[in-house]
Regions:
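Short aromatic/hydrophobic "clamp" motif used to bind/position activated sugar donors
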Residues: 85
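Short alpha-helix within the catalytic core of nucleotide-sugar-dependent glycosyltransferases
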Residues: 18-19, 45, 74, 82, ...
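A conserved acidic beta->alpha catalytic loop
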Residues: 36-45, 89
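Conserved nucleotide-sugar donor-binding catalytic segment
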Residues: 4, 136-215
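Short loop->beta transition adjacent to catalytic acidic/histidine clusters or analogous donor-positioning motifs
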Residues: 22-34, 55-59
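Glycine-rich, basic loop-to-helix element that forms the pyrophosphate-binding segment
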Residues: 63-80, 101
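Conserved donor NDP-sugar-binding/catalytic core segment of glycosyltransferases
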Residues: 97-130
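Short, well-formed alpha-helical segments that are part of the catalytic scaffolds
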Residues: 9-24
Length: 252
C-alpha cells in the first residue's frame, strides 16, 4: 500500500484511513509505504507514531519539503517491495474486504495491470452518503471511456509496480496525476479492470469541489487533452468536444 500525508491533512481522518487498511481489513497488507510530504502537525505525527508502534509493516519516508502528490507517490512506488501495490488516500475509508477482493481478482485474471472499483462519497459521518461514482468494468470499455473521462477511481486502485514504472510512473499535474498516468499506461497497452463493487468510501466536502475548478484545474485538464491528441489517442473533433464539455462543467 502507498499513502502520502501532508500538513493540511486532518489527523482524525488520517487515523480512520489507516485503521481501514489495517485493523478493519480482512487481509492486512504486507507493507504500507507512508510518505510524509514535508512538515506535519504534532497530531498527525502522533497518529504515525501510534500505527508504526502497532504494525511493523509501515515503511515511513520523510521529506523535508512538500513536493506534491505526484512526486510523493512516485517515491512511494520506488520504495515499495512488492509487485502489487494498492493506492490509499489519507482521509478516505477502504471497505473491509477491499484487498481480499482485489487480490482474488488478480489471481483469477493475472494479465490485469490496474484494478479499481466503484466509490461512494460521504460528508461528515460515513453513513451520510451523498454520491457514488460507478466506472466501466472491462478493459475495452475502460479504454474507450478514457478518451473522454477518467475510467478509474484513483483511490481504489491496485496495480502492478512494473507496469506503472514502464509508463513513467506519476508525474505532477494539478489534481490529475492519476488520469495522466492511466493515459500513458493506455498507450503502453496496459490491461485495466474494475470490480463492479464499492471498494472505498471517499470523504468529500465543498473544499474538494472548489479545488477541482478554476483556471489551474482547467489547464491541467487541457494538458491531458493536448497529450491525447498529440499521440493519436483521440481525434480533433473529440478533442474539441472534450474541451467544450469541461468549459460547460465550469472547470474554469
Amino acid at each position: 500500500v502507498i499513502i502520502s500525508v501532508y500538513k493540511n491533512d486532518n489527523a482524525v481522518f488520517f487515523s480512520r484511513a489507516l485503521d481501514s487498511i489495517t485493523e478493519s481489513q480482512t487481509i492486512i497488507p504486507n507493507e504500507i509505504v507512508l510518505v510524509v510530504d514535508g512538515p506535519i502537525s504534532k497530531e498527525i505525527e502522533d497518529v504515525i507514531s501510534e500505527y508504526t508502534k502497532k504494525y511493523v509493516i509501515f515503511k515511513v519516508i520523510r521529506l523535508k519539503k512538500n513536493v506534491g502528490l505526484g512526486k510523493a507517490l512516485k517515491l512511494a512506488i520506488e520504495n515499495s517491495t512488492y509487485e502489487l501495490i494498492a493506492r490509499m488516500d489519507s482521509d478516505d475509508v477502504s471497505v473491509p474486504t477491499r484487498f481480499e477482493e482485489q487480490l482474488a481478482y488478480f489471481e483469477l485474471k493475472p494479465e490485469t495491470d490496474v484494478l479499481g472499483g466503484d466509490i461512494t462519497e460521504f460528508i461528515g459521518e460515513e453513513h451520510n452518503i451523498v454520491g457514488k461514482r460507478v466506472v466501466p468494468l472491462s478493459n475495452d470499455c475502460i479504454r474507450e471511456f478514457m478518451k473522454e473521462r477518467c475510467g478509474m477511481n484513483h483511490v481504489s486502485v491496485m496495480y502492478k509496480k512494473e507496469a506503472v514504472k514502464q509508463a513513467g510512473s506519476y508525474l505532477d499535474l494539478f489534481w490529475n496525476e492519476d488520469y495522466y498516468l492511466w493515459i500513458r499506461m493506455w498507450m503502453k497497452n496496459a490491461v485495466f479492470a474494475n470490480t463492479g463493487s464499492v471498494l472505498v468510501n471517499v470523504r468529500v466536502g465543498t473544499d474538494m469541489y472548489k479545488r477541482r475548478g478554476g483556471s489551474k484545474y482547467f489547464k491541467s485538464e487541457k494538458k491531458i487533452q493536448d497529450y491525447m491528441l498529440k499521440y493519436g489517442m483521440i481525434s480533433y473533433p473529440l478533442y474539441i468536444k472534450n474541451i467544450a464539455k469541461r468549459l460547460q462543467d465550469g472547470k474554469i
